[in-house]
């Protein structure tokens, strides 16, 4: 799986964390997955036959979809703010 560089990861965590020590809330996890998905999508545009990476991308998208579904049911307002901030829904 493709990982983000530590500076980019810390920047995303600081932007989406709920409190100072928050690194694992659903919002942060979704934001990190979205960044990894965008990075891997760019990779697959350059390397369209990389099917192993494509499978990893599909797994990440599925994991993000499940987390978004959970967030939509538990905290609908936070869900709407998050998708608007990330620009992942219409």
From Swiss-Prot:
Source domain of life: Bacteria
GO cellular component terms listed in the entry, alphabetical order: cytosolic small ribosomal subunit
Record-linked SUPFAM superfamilies: S15/NS1 RNA-binding domain
Pfam family, one: Ribosomal_S15
Record has Ribonucleoprotein as a keyword: yes
HAMAP family documented for this protein: Ribosomal_uS15_B (MF_01343_B)
Protein name listed in UniProt: Small ribosomal subunit protein uS15
UniProt GO BP: translation
């Amino acid at each position: 799986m493709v990982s983000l560089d530590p500076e980019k990861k810390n920047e995303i965590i600081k932007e989406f964390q709920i409190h100072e020590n928050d690194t694992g809330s659903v919002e942060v996890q979704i934001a990190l997955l979205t960044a990894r998905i965008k990075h891997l999508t760019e990779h697959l545009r350059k390397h369209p036959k990389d099917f192993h990476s494509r499978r990893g991308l599909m797994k990440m998208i599925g994991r993000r979809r499940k987390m978004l579904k959970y967030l939509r049911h538990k905290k609908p307002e936070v869900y709407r703010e998050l998708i608007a901030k990330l620009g992942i829904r219409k």
